[in-house]
Amino acid sequence: MTKYIFVTGGVVSSLGKGITAASLGRLLKNRGLNVTIQKFDPYINVDPGTMSPYQHGEVFVTDDGAETDLDLGHYERFIDINLNKYSNVTTGKIYSSVLQKERRGEYLGGTVQVIPHITNEIKERVYRSGRETNADVVITEIGGTVGDIESLPFLEAIRQIKSDIGRDNVMYIHCTLIPYLKAAGEMKTKPTQHSVKELRSLGIQPNIIVVRTEMPVSQDMKDKLALFCDIDTKAVIEARDADTLYAVPLSLQEQNMDQIVCDHLKLDNPAADMTEWTALVNKVRNLSKKTKIALVGKYVELQDAYISVVEALRHAGYSFDTDVEVKWVNAEHVTAENVKELVGDTDGILVPGGFGDRGVEGKIVAIQYARENKVPFLGICLGMQLASIEFARNVLGLEGANSSEINPDTPYAIIDLLPEQKDVEDLGGTLRLGLYPCKLAEETNAYNAYNEPVVYERHRHRYEFNNQFRPDMEKEGFVFSGTSPDGRLVEIIELKDHPWFVAAQFHPELVSRPNRPQPLFHDFVRASITNKESK
């Protein structure tokens, strides 16, 4: 029978529930269990696709085209699985589904209420995740903090699941904070006690408490928490700040967290073999070289907006025993006069995806600098579109060349709406989303990176390269190294007379893994290291 683990949070948000859930997933997978994982977000948006990155951070896209929470990126990177649209559920999705059923008359004329209709829908999403993946274990993270009004239906639903399928098949893990008061020189357990009290008042008794802390938690403090929270002392797990995220699974294993989980759920599996993971962490902690990459974006104040990009750069660096330092460059501040000052000390330049016109001209200036000064360059989504526009303006001499997204009246729409997008009115969920094939041209940097004729990558865009400009740009050394199999859509571009200048319409960062870097990032970082060594 499928087992269910629920991860909740208390005291404050951003405690690392997602990392805790992902780390536990890795440990259970390495015990030979088939693990799937999902995130429940209590906001009323249907998905984060139309939310500002400042509100929510990065939008992570799954193979099947779901726009999801950035925690799914952690899940995929840690557990090394590909998730799907059932892996991220919001209040908006739940209510939308219930209202559609009500309109179809599925409730037989009854009054539709939070209990049982909303809670039943939430439970069905939990069970469906297990059914769709044939999982041995389903880990579900509940977003937000215990005490939030928005979370109440989700907490009630997961409370009911224990009654529905039995206590041996359900486990509750609560993540909290033990703050350190510098003035008093003390760590305080009271916030955790109150958070657990709140959770218990809702009918949920946590089986494990994971305490986030800056300082070591003494045995006396663990005993105190165990007493007041009514759990075993061994089930108080310390989650101290780590030097690398990838060390967290090893820390949890040292404290026998996965064994406690297996004992409670009556799973008789051998201990997790973390040899390969330990080697990865040792490598990460002992990188001997450095390279610096400029990330030129418009959301640089909130680095979570580019979290998968940064992780993909790091993964690529691990292959070369190199620590990749990201220099954050605000695209709005970049001008032709100061671009050398802002990016001249870096070994490579990356322009990530985005929407809208803010910061676009600064990104184009940075791309021009990379092209003219032979600096390794990687463009992603909007970065690929702007690389095309920069080339059209400054090599072909097409003054005013632009994207019709940025300037609908441009005389040269190098980037234009996909034909199927022309009549689309809704913004949410209507982009070209998910996994699509890309055919690679031989004897190109793109082909050399993948070493395969056809690859599959995840997309999230509405605009595409305008094919009427292809012949003129090709004559000037602009290479279309990746296209859709029918040749209609441009997927990857690069430059002939440049050490390494590649840009992709898709989002390669979404499939990178710490032990298996994404090929374009791998070769981009290698080119950046070569550039540094040649200076």
From Swiss-Prot:
UniProt binding sites for CTP: S13, D148, I149, E150, K188, T189, K190, P191, T192, Q193, K224
Single biological process term from Gene Ontology: CTP biosynthetic process
One Gene Ontology MF term: CTP synthase activity
E.C. code: 6.3.4.2
Residue stretches in coiled coil: none
Binding site for ATP: S14, L15, G16, K17, G18, I19, D71, R240, D241, A242
Associated pathway: Pyrimidine metabolism; CTP biosynthesis via de novo pathway; CTP from UDP: step 2/2
Domain of life: Bacteria
One Pfam family from the record: CTP_synth_N
Binding positions for UTP per the UniProt entry: S13, K188, T189, K190, P191, T192, Q193, K224
Cellular component terms per the entry's GO annotation: cytosol
Catalytic activity: UTP + L-glutamine + ATP + H2O = CTP + L-glutamate + ADP + phosphate + 2 H(+); L-glutamine + H2O = L-glutamate + NH4(+); UTP + NH4(+) + ATP = CTP + ADP + phosphate + 2 H(+)
Binding site for Mg(2+): D71, E141
Residues covered by region (Amidoligase domain): 1-267
Residues of the active site: C381, H507, E509
Family matches, as CDD domains: CTPS_N, GATase1_CTP_Synthase
Annotated HAMAP family: PyrG (MF_01227)
Chain's role: Catalyzes the ATP-dependent amination of UTP to CTP with either L-glutamine or ammonia as the source of nitrogen. Regulates intracellular CTP levels through interactions with the four ribonucleotide triphosphates.
Subunit annotation: Homotetramer.
Official protein name in the record: CTP synthase
Species the sequence originates in: Bacillus cereus (strain ATCC 14579 / DSM 31 / CCUG 7414 / JCM 2152 / NBRC 15305 / NCIMB 9373 / NCTC 2599 / NRRL B-3711)
